[in-house]
Amino acid sequence: MDGIVTEVAVGVKRGSDELLSGSVLSSPNSNMSGMVVTANGNDSKKFKGEDKMDGAPSRVLHIRKLPGEVTETEVIALGLPFGKVTNILMLKGKNQAFLELATEEAAITMVNYYSAVTPHLRNQPIYIQYSNHKELKTDNTLNQRAQVVLQAVTAVQTANTPLSGTTVSESAVTPAQSPVLRIIIDNMYYPVTLDVLHQIFSKFGAVLKIITFTKNNQFQALLQYGDPVNAQQAKLALDGQNIYNACCTLRIDFSKLVNLNVKYNNDKSRDYTRPDLPSGDGQPALDPAIAAAFAKETSLLAVPGALSPLAIPNAAAAAAAAAAGRVGMPGVSAGGNTVLLVSNLNEEMVTPQSLFTLFGVYGDVQRVKILYNKKDSALIQMADGNQSQLAMNHLNGQKMYGKIIRVTLSKHQTVQLPREGLDDQGLTKDFGNSPLHRFKKPGSKNFQNIFPPSATLHLSNIPPSVAEEDLRTLFANTGGTVKAFKFFQDHKMALLQMATVEEAIQALIDLHNYNLGENHHLRVSFSKSTI
């Protein structure tokens, strides 16, 4: 459950007398149709209901001790796991609310659960019990905002079909919009951090929670606002924009979720209403100095030649990369270096050339050294810190020659070449002037096609004389199974799917730059597509 931590404290069930104190009440046994509740001292909200025996089950629940800034969406989310929420009345001046569920059974389940597990909103325990009313009737003209939120959440829960609007006023909110956005980053050459997303999306309202993850070989995020209106504004303004100059394109849709469950505050997920959450996987928060420098650099203003208002100058992009991985880029005073330590290699199979080819998918490898006294480990020097971070992010934990490799940043600043005349058995190789570097040309399309290892490979530079069967046979000879193949229309490019990611890695190592004849050397990279 979102925002819930297990504690012993349990709210004492009682009626809504305290909630309604100071309001106009009818006698205990009379119809309460004329009751007026003052919600915040300024505006009045009419509430109609029927009196019930204190503590008896009801589908209308009374919630108290709410934080002052809590939103309707957060309160509604408390009830969603148990059934459909049919009405809500917020009494913000009293930090309390009524929540109506579709059935009494759902309300009983909810109360029973929260009697054992104290719910928290914004790091504050809240208390839930049955109200004295079996139905919640509100004047929608005086409760308009809550009704807008409730309609949006209900539509998402039942239809799960995101709609895009054309205006951003509250009255124009379409029913199937959630306060949670699903964000996909295309052409992600620079790392996009959780803090980058928070800075960008905070311009449209208070961001409550963010979760980042990789799915379908793409970096994605779920981001929750306190209000669906803010989510709509952000989607309309940011969908299709670039975070950095000519890359990192935002693809935004409304999520099917209406509330996010964040368990840890770290570099992958954050609940801004729960600063007490543990880091979980041990990842520390961003260094204050880096965070401050990043905030200063990234003004999110347009720059000449940029494709969108979100484009950020190169220095800011470098700062983002530094913030993401604490690595350095030329001209940026950030810690870290360009050298990676790769361990748990298959020492019988690995060579400097195979490491150059694999790590070269994510940057221009300068030098490779397999350690003389520990041949299952190697040092790899990339062209810059951003490339080393990308390679580490994408290759750590992948299988190469049957072993799961580990990739970390090294303490070394450079990879030393062996002294002249010293035979190191070919364990060290300098690739500084290699013609196979993918990223040496500024603005190369390779910058826009960096994806995690996948079973599907993208093939290019195929000569006209090479047929599908030729390529299938070629890739099958690497020891794997070709599951699918598809030529592009011009037959110069194709997609080829191996049985596993490990087989695809092996095929890429073996066949990238393979001579197909007619002065055509095959280009192989990982694809985000499937066949």
UniProtKB/Swiss-Prot annotation:
Domain (RRM) ranges: 59-133, 181-257, 338-412, 455-529
N-acetylmethionine found at: M1
GO biological process: cerebellum development; mRNA splice site recognition; negative regulation of RNA splicing; regulation of neural precursor cell proliferation; spinal cord development
Main location: nucleus
GO cellular component terms given for this protein: growth cone; neuronal cell body; spliceosomal complex
Gene3D superfamilies hit by this protein: 3.30.70.330
Assembly information from the UniProt record: Monomer. Identified in a mRNP complex, at least composed of DHX9, DDX3X, ELAVL1, HNRNPU, IGF2BP1, ILF3, PABPC1, PCBP2, PTBP2, STAU1, STAU2, SYNCRIP and YBX1. Part of a ternary complex containing KHSRP and HNRPH1. Interacts with NOVA1; the interaction is direct. Interacts with NOVA2; the interaction is direct.
A Gene Ontology molecular function term of the record: mRNA binding
InterPro entries: HnRNP-L/PTB, Nucleotide-bd_a/b_plait_sf, PTBP1-like_RRM2, PTBP2_RRM1, PTBP2_RRM3, PTBP2_RRM4, RBD_domain_sf, RRM_dom
Keyword terms of this UniProt record: Acetylation, mRNA processing, mRNA splicing, Nucleus, Phosphoprotein, Repeat, RNA-binding
PANTHER family per UniProt: MATRIN 3/NUCLEAR PROTEIN 220-RELATED (PTHR15592)
Residues recorded with modification Phosphoserine: S26, S27, S308
Localization annotation: Nucleus
Protein name stated in the entry: Polypyrimidine tract-binding protein 2
Function: RNA-binding protein which binds to intronic polypyrimidine tracts and mediates negative regulation of exons splicing. May antagonize in a tissue-specific manner the ability of NOVA1 to activate exon selection. In addition to its function in pre-mRNA splicing, also plays a role in the regulation of translation.
Domain of life: Eukaryota
Pfam families: RRM_1, RRM_5, RRM_8
Tissues and organs where the protein is expressed, per its UniProt entry: Mainly expressed in brain, including cerebellum, brainstem, spinal cord, and hypothalamus. Also expressed in the peripheral nervous system and neural crest derivatives, including the dorsal root and trigeminal ganglia, the cochlear spiral and intestinal ganglion cells, and the adrenal medulla. Also detected to a lower extent in testis, heart, liver, lung, skeletal muscle and thymus (at protein level).
